Swiss-Prot record:
Compartment(s) where it occurs, according to its Swiss-Prot or TrEMBL record: Endoplasmic reticulum membrane
Residues in the Lumenal compartment per record: 1-49
Listed name of the protein: Small integral membrane protein 14
Cytoplasmic side: 71-99
GN (gene name): Smim14
Keyword Endoplasmic reticulum: yes
Species of origin: Rattus norvegicus (Rat)
InterPro entries per record: Uncharacterised_CD034/YQF4
Keyword Transmembrane helix carried by entry: yes
Amino acid sequence: MAEGGFDPCECICSHEHAMRRLINLLRQSQSYCTDTECLRELPGPSGDSGISITVILMAWMVIAVLLFLLRPPNLRGSSLPGKPSSPHSGQDPPAPPVD
């Protein structure tokens, strides 16, 4: 607690507000649980929401492979036998003329 009896944390989250949230949480859980059983399916988003994270990751992998296979020839770095890999055919470039 701060000096003078003023608590700045109480401006953000008071004890009454915390107790109100706790009571609401207990009331919600009581509507889904009885004395003998608790229902497994609570309200909210269900487990089978259609598309899972695995399907999304597999789709991204397929897109990445397709982009890799369909990249332009200048990014492929191909080394064809009749085509030199560099403009100087593996030799050092000529030295500049000295005047």
